[in-house]
A protein has these predicted regions:
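Walker B catalytic acidic pair
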Residues: 298, 304-305, 316
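Short loop/turn elements that form and flank the Walker-type P-loop nucleotide-binding site
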Residues: 59-62, 99-100, 130-132, 150, ...
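Peripheral, non-AAA+ core regions of ATP-driven protein-machinery
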Residues: 1-216, 220-226, 264, 329, ...
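Walker A/P-loop
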Residues: 216-258, 323
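Basic, amphipathic alpha-helical bundle interface domains used for macromolecular binding and assembly
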Residues: 34, 40-45, 60, 67-77, ...
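Catalytic P-loop NTPase motifs of RecA-like helicase/translocase cores
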Residues: 112, 303-310, 353
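P-loop NTPase nucleotide-binding/switch module
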Residues: 170-207, 211, 238-293
Length: 507
């Protein structure tokens, strides 16, 4: 007799419906799984056998063949334990008569029949809804995550016994839909009010966050670069529900999701160590998991002491900085993961950190300085919209009483600028100025004849590329938004151009 159940295999963040078939015949005792299973799926034979035996005792010691279709798609992970068990149970027990044609099953089984949580539940649930399935049966610990998806019943089960009761017609109360609420700025520790001075850098940070622009801070050790970067979560806007779904799906596949929380509520702020490998950064490995740049999707990737990373590692950032996605190649296909992040980096001007200082002597040779800065290639630097110098703060300013402007005040301005951008791009499928393409640039970044001449002079004097020009216009548009100006004025353009000219010009 042949029994069937449906599950979903993940391919990156995309799902493919898998039909699990069980054929049980009265031949010699054996248990085979075919259809490109990986090691974890092959090992499910022992887990399923013990789980059924310890739950119902109704395991058929005959010839069992499990087919996972389509046969040309690799199935990875232990999430197929439950649908395999369901097909076997339905084949040998004619009391399990519930119609499961519109149901997806996922879950790992313990030897005693408990359902263990699995990764990738949110993208699996989204795929199930997209494919028209009415419900998904899954481990109870995964229910919170799956409940972010409306329009599909989430049936949580603690063990195989509960699933058997469900298959026999008993009802399990669906898990309620979870309403998304983003986390607000007062939940973060770092606040701009504690950053003394640094008015140029603070302004640059506000502009960068308002438009989602990449930013590089250059300054001596202890000048406040890292402190400024750590204030970004306190001024960055909350995620939309759609952004939270995307981000949560990535963390779910990666296996980094807090199952009690079930959702990523705040924008990611990812800080890779400078020894991180290429695979750790961009993703890959045997199971092709997302990398750290994908974990920073819809948030911030902060590289402290940028030249300490290998040049090869830094060059891996070029494609995602341009496209917002990273393509990870494997033997027979390419898997794409979202990687639309705001890059924020900091560095010293030279190995000793004193180059350009008015009070300390730089002990580096010209060769050492060139070698240090050469870690950051011209094409990568060209993709960084805002480059700002962070000088040391004078003592009197450092000990002055009273707080500086708070993060909450800055955040209010950032939110207003972002609202302008969302309204502007509501029909374009983008959310902020940094995501503009050439069509949006031509429509929303029109310069007056006078400002166009200014742009031309700067283009020629600074030796800018076409990409640099586009990025200057995007930054100028953001500065205009902060001023509530419909047009890009001369002062907006001058400020944007100023962020492209620094001590790094000779790099």
């Amino acid at each position: 007799m042949v029994s069937k159940a449906k599950s979903i295999a993940l391919y990156g963040l995309d799902g493919i419906v898998v039909e699990v078939e069980a054929d049980i015949t009265k031949l010699e005792e054996k248990f085979d799984i075919v259809g490109l299973p990986d090691t974890a799926v092959k090992e499910s034979k022992d887990r399923v056998r013990s789980a059924i035996k310890n739950t119902s005792g109704n395991f058929p010691y005959t010839s069992i063949t499990i087919n996972l279709a389509p046969a040309d798609v690799k199935k990875e992970g232990a999430y197929l334990d439950l649908p395999i068990a369901v097909t076997i149970l339905r084949a040998v027990d004619n009391k399990l008569t519930r119609d499961i044609g519109g149901t997806i099953f996922i879950g790992e089984l313990s030897l005693e029949g408990k359902l263990r949580p699995v990764t990738g539940v949110l993208p699996i649930t989204l795929c199930a809804k997209k494919e028209g399935y009415k419900r998904i049966v899954l481990p109870y610990e995964n229910a919170k995550e799956a409940s972010l998806v409306s329009g599909i019943e989430i049936i949580p089960a603690e063990n195989l016994k509960k699933v058997i009761e469900f298959l026999s017609g008993e009802e399990i109360e669906p898990y309620p839909f979870t309403e998304f609420v983003g986390k607000t700025a007062d939940e973060y520790a770092s606040d701009l009010k504690y950053v003394k001075g640094q008015y140029v850098a603070r302004r640059a940070l506000e502009v960068a966050v308002s438009g989602g622009h990449n930013m590089l801070m250059v300054g001596a050790p202890g000048s406040g670069k890292t402190m400024l970067a750590k204030c970004i979560p306190s001024i960055i806007p909350d995620m939309t529900f759609e952004e939270a779904l995307e981000t949560t799906a990535i963390y779910s596949v990666y296996g980094a999701l807090d199952r009690k929380e079930g959702v990523i509520r705040k924008r990611p702020f990812v800080t890779p160590h400078h020894t991180a490998t290429n695979i750790a950064l961009v993703g890959g490995g045997q199971s092709v998991k997302p990398g750290l740049i994908s974990l920073a999707h819809n948030g911030v990737l902060y590289l402290d002491e940028m030249p300490e990373y290998t040049r090869q590692t830094l060059e891996c950032l070029r494609q995602p900085l341009e496209d917002g996605v990273i393509t990870v190649s494997r033997a027979k296909a390419n898997i794409k993961y979202p990687a639309d992040f705001m890059l924020v980096a900091s560095m010293n001007p030279c190995p000793c950190g004193n180059y350009g200082s008015a009070t300390k002597e730089c002990k580096c040779t010209d060769t050492q300085i060139r070698k240090y800065r050469a870690k950051i290639s011209g094409p990568l630097l060209d993709r960084i919209d805002i480059q700002v110098q962070v000088d040391n703060v004078e003592y009197d300013q450092l000990v002055a009483k009273g707080d500086e402007e708070s993060s909450e005040t800055v955040r209010q301005r950032v939110n207003k600028a972002r609202l302008i951008q969302r309204e502007r791009f509501k029909d374009d499928g983008i959310l902020c100025n940094a995501q503009m393409g050439e069509r949006q640039l031509a429509k929303y970044c029109v310069l007056s004849p006078e400002n166009d001449k200014l742009m031309k002079r700067s283009f020629e004097a600074l030796g800018l590329s076409a990409r640099a020009r586009s990025r200057i216009l995007k930054v100028a548009r953001t500065i205009a938004d902060l001023d509530y100006s419909e047009t890009i004025e001369k002062k907006h353009l001058l400020e944007a151009i100023g962020y492209r000219s620094s001590m790094l010009d000779d790099m």
